[in-house]
C-alpha cells in the first residue's frame, strides 16, 4: 500500500478549484460577487472567446490594501466572517475565502487594485504562484483579468460545452446578479460587443426591460408581501405571458440567486389553475429575511440553501402572488363572471394589421380553418410585439363553421392502407365492444344522425359513433402539418413589420439559427438591441399569427434535441389546440363531408394527442348490450 503523504499546496488548490470553478461562468460569478460584497455600484465584465481566453471584471468598490494582496489569494482567507457565530449570520454573497485562490490555481491572473484614490498595486499570479507585485496607478476599486483558464488542467476543457453555450451561461449569471441588485450598474461585453447594460438606478422594471424586453416589462405586475419573518417584493407576469420552462423564474434571497423547487412550486400555486399545462410564468421574486433563518453553507456554488420556516415562506409567496394577480384583474372572481356582460368576438378586432397581398404562392390554395365567435366567449385583446404569449387559451372559444368543409384541400394524402379494400370486412381488424377501432382502413360511413356531442353513422350492419371535436382536431392537425412540410410555404405580408424583443440569452440563440427557422416559414432578420424583425408570416398561422409565431420560437428555444420532424409535430399540435372547435349541430351535408374527410385523414381513429375519434358497435355488440344472447 502506498504511504500516506500530504498534498502540495498547488495540488490542493487545483482540487479545491474543481469544486468552485467549473467553467468560465463560475469565474464571472465569483468575481462579481466579490465586487458586490465590496460595495461596488459599477461593475463591468468583458470576456473574449467565451471566457476561455480572457475574462476581466472591474469595479469601483472598496479595493484591496497593498499589504493584503498575498492574503487575498490564499485559501480560506476572507474579510467577511471571523467567528463560528458569523457562519450562521452571513449577510454577504461570499464568505469561504476560496474564490481568488481557486481562480489563480487554474489560470493566469492579473489584479490591479486600490483602497483609496492615492495609489494602488498590481500583482500577477499563475497557477497559484505569485510572479509579480508592484505599485501602480489605480482609481479606487479592483480590476481582475483572468487569462487562459484551465491552462494547467487541460482535461477540464473537454467537459466544457460549445462556445455559444458557455457564452449563454455567462449572460445568465450576470442577468441574475443584475436582477438581484438593481441599484448596481452592470455592463457585459463579449469580444467588445455589449450584451447587457443596466443603469443602476434601483429600478427593477427597467432592468427587466434591459434583459427580457420593454414590452414584457411594461406588463409585469407588482408583487408585495410581508410577514413577521419575511418580506417579498418583485414583478411577475400575468397568467397568459408564460414560457415553457422555469428558467425565467428568478428567486433572489437577500440578493443571492438561489434554486429552490418548493419555493418555485409555491409561485406556481399562486397562479392557481390559470396557467396552461407545462407553462411557467416570468417572475423576479426578491425575498428579504434575517440571515439567521438561512444556511448558505450547503453547496460550493451557494445556489442551494436551507431555510428555516420554509412552509411559512411558501404560504406567503402563494398568497402574495394570488393577491397581486387579483389586484391587477388577472384572476376573475366568481361574482364578476356572473355580472360581467359577455362580449362577442370578431377576428377583425384583433390588433394585427395584415397586407392583403400574398407572396410566394407557388402552391395550390391551402385550407385555412374559418372560425366564428362563440357567443359566450369573452374578448381578449392582444397588443403587438408578442407581449402576451398565450392569451388565446385552450378553452374552446371558437366554433368551426360550415365553410371548413368548403375550404378543405381535396389533395389530402390518403391512408397508406387505402388500397387494401379486402381487409375492411375482416372481423379481426376491428375491436368491438365499444373500444377504439384499431383497423388501418375506415369504411365509407353513411351519416344517420347526431347527438350534441357525437355523430352517428353506419356501414352495413355496424354502428359507428364519432366524436365531432376530435375529428375536426385530426383534420386541422393534418392540414397544418402538411403546410409545415411544404417546400413552398405561402407568406402573408405585413403592413407594419413586427419587431420581436427577446432576453439577451434568447436573442443570441435565435440569431445564430435564423436560417434554421426558415424551415418553419419564419424569415426573421436581426434588428439589433436584442430584437428580431418579421416582415411576413406563413398563411397557416392565422388567425392568431402573432401568438403562434412566439409559440414556435418558444418551442425552438427549448428543444432538447435537434429533431425537425418532432418539432413540426409539436407546432402543429399547439396550433390545433389554439384553433379548438366547439361541438355544434351539423346539417346532413356537413356531417357526411366530415366523415369523408376523416376517412382520408392520416389517422381517422385518434387525434394527434391519442384521443379516440370513432367507436364501432357490431350487431353482436348491441345484442349483448340488450342481453339478447342470453
Swiss-Prot record:
GO terms for molecular function: ATP binding; ATP hydrolysis activity; ATP-dependent DNA damage sensor activity; mismatched DNA binding. It comes from the Bacteria. GO terms for cellular component: mismatch repair complex. Belongs to the DNA mismatch repair MutL/HexB family. Disulfide bonds: none annotated. InterPro entries: DNA_mismatch_repair_CS, DNA_mismatch_repair_MutL, DNA_mismatch_S5_2-like, HATPase_C_sf, MutL/Mlh/PMS, MutL/Mlh/Pms-like, MutL_C, MutL_C_dimsub. The keyword Ligase does not apply. It comes from Lactobacillus johnsonii (strain CNCM I-12250 / La1 / NCC 533). GO terms for biological process: mismatch repair. Keywords: DNA damage, DNA repair. This protein is involved in the repair of mismatches in DNA. It is required for dam-dependent methyl-directed DNA mismatch repair. May act as a 'molecular matchmaker', a protein that promotes the formation of a stable complex between two or more DNA-binding proteins in an ATP-dependent manner without itself being part of a final effector complex. The gene is mutL. This is DNA mismatch repair protein MutL. It holds the Pfam family MutL_C. Gene3D superfamilies: 3.30.230.10, Histidine kinase-like ATPase, C-terminal domain (3.30.565.10), MutL, C-terminal domain, dimerisation subdomain (3.30.1540.20), MutL, C-terminal domain, regulatory subdomain (3.30.1370.100).
Amino acid at each position: 500500500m502506498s504511504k500516506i503523504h500530504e498534498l502540495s499546496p498547488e495540488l490542493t488548490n487545483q482540487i479545491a478549484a474543481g469544486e468552485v470553478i467549473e467553467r468560465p461562468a463560475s469565474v464571472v460569478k465569483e468575481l462579481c460577487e466579490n465586487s458586490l460584497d465590496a460595495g461596488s455600484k459599477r461593475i463591468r465584465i468583458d470576456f473574449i472567446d467565451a471566457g476561455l481566453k480572457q475574462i476581466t471584471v472591474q469595479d469601483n468598490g472598496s479595493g484591496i490594501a497593498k499589504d493584503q494582496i498575498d492574503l487575498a489569494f490564499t485559501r480560506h482567507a476572507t474579510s467577511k466572517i471571523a467567528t463560528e457565530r458569523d457562519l450562521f449570520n452571513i449577510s454577504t454573497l461570499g464568505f469561504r475565502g476560496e474564490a481568488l485562490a481557486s481562480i489563480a490555481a487554474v489560470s493566469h491572473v492579473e489584479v490591479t487594485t486600490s483602497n483609496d484614490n492615492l495609489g494602488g498595486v498590481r500583482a500577477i499570479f499563475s497557477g497559484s504562484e505569485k510572479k509579480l507585485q508592484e505599485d501602480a496607478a489605480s482609481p479606487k476599486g479592483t480590476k481582475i483579468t483572468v487569462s487562459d483558464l484551465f491552462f494547467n488542467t487541460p482535461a477540464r476543457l473537454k467537459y466544457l460545452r460549445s462556445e455559444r453555450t458557455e457564452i449563454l451561461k455567462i449572460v445568465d449569471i450576470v442577468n441574475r446578479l443584475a436582477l438581484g441588485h438593481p441599484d448596481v450598474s452592470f455592463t457585459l461585453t463579449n469580444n467588445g460587443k455589449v450584451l447587457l447594460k443596466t443603469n443602476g438606478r434601483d429600478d427593477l422594471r427597467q432592468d427587466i426591460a434591459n434583459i427580457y424586453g420593454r414590452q414584457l416589462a411594461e406588463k409585469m405586475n407588482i408583487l408585495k408581501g410581508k410577514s413577521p419573518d419575511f418580506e417579498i417584493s418583485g414583478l411577475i407576469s400575468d397568467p397568459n405571458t408564460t414560457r415553457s420552462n422555469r428558467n425565467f423564474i428568478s428567486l433572489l434571497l437577500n440578493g443571492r440567486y438561489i434554486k429552490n423547487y418548493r419555493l418555485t412550486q409555491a409561485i406556481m400555486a399562486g397562479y392557481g389553475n390559470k396557467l396552461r399545462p407545462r407553462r411557467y410564468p416570468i417572475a423576479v421574486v426578491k425575498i428579504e429575511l434575517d440571515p439567521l433563518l438561512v444556511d448558505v453553507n450547503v453547496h460550493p456554488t451557494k445556489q442551494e440553501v436551507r431555510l428555516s420556516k420554509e412552509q411559512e415562506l411558501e404560504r406567503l409567496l402563494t398568497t402574495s402572488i394570488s393577491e397581486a394577480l387579483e389586484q391587477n384583474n388577472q384572476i376573475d372572481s366568481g361574482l364578476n363572471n356572473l355580472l360581467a356582460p359577455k362580449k362577442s368576438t370578431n377576428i377583425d378586432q384583433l390588433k394585427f394589421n395584415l397586407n392583403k397581398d400574398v407572396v410566394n404562392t407557388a402552391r395550390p390554395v391551402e385550407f385555412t380553418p374559418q372560425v366564428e365567435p362563440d357567443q359566450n366567449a369573452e374578448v381578449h385583446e392582444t397588443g403587438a410585439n408578442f407581449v402576451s404569449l398565450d392569451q388565446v387559451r385552450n378553452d374552446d372559444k371558437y366554433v368551426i363553421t360550415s365553410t371548413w368543409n368548403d375550404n378543405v384541400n381535396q389533395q389530402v394524402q390518403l391512408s397508406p392502407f387505402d388500397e387494401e379494400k379486402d381487409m375492411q370486412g375482416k372481423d379481426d381488424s376491428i375491436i368491438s365492444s365499444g373500444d377504439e377501432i384499431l383497423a388501418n382502413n375506415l369504411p365509407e360511413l353513411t351519416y344517420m344522425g347526431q347527438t350534441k356531442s357525437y355523430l352517428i353513422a353506419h356501414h352495413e350492419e355496424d354502428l359507428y359513433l364519432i366524436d365531432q371535436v376530435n375529428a375536426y382536431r385530426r383534420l386541422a392537425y393534418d392540414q397544418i402539418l402538411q403546410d409545415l412540410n411544404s417546400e413552398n410555404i405561402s407568406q402573408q405580408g405585413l403592413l407594419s413589420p413586427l419587431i420581436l424583443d427577446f432576453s439577451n440569452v434568447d436573442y443570441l440563440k435565435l440569431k445564430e439559427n435564423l436560417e434554421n427557422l426558415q424551415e418553419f416559414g419564419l424569415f426573421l432578420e436581426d434588428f439589433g438591441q436584442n430584437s428580431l424583425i418579421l416582415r411576413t408570416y406563413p398563411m397557416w398561422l392565422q388567425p392568431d399569427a402573432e401568438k403562434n409565431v412566439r409559440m414556435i420560437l418558444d418551442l425552438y428555444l427549448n428543444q432538447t434535441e435537434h429533431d425537425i420532424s418532432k418539432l413540426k409535430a409539436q407546432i402543429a399540435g399547439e396550433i390545433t389546440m389554439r384553433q379548438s372547435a366547439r361541438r355544434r349541430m351539423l346539417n346532413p351535408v356537413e356531417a357526411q363531408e366530415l366523415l369523408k374527410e376523416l376517412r382520408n385523414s392520416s389517422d381517422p381513429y385518434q387525434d394527434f394527442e391519442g384521443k379516440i375519434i370513432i367507436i364501432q358497435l357490431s350487431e353482436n355488440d348491441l345484442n349483448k348490450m340488450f342481453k339478447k344472447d342470453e
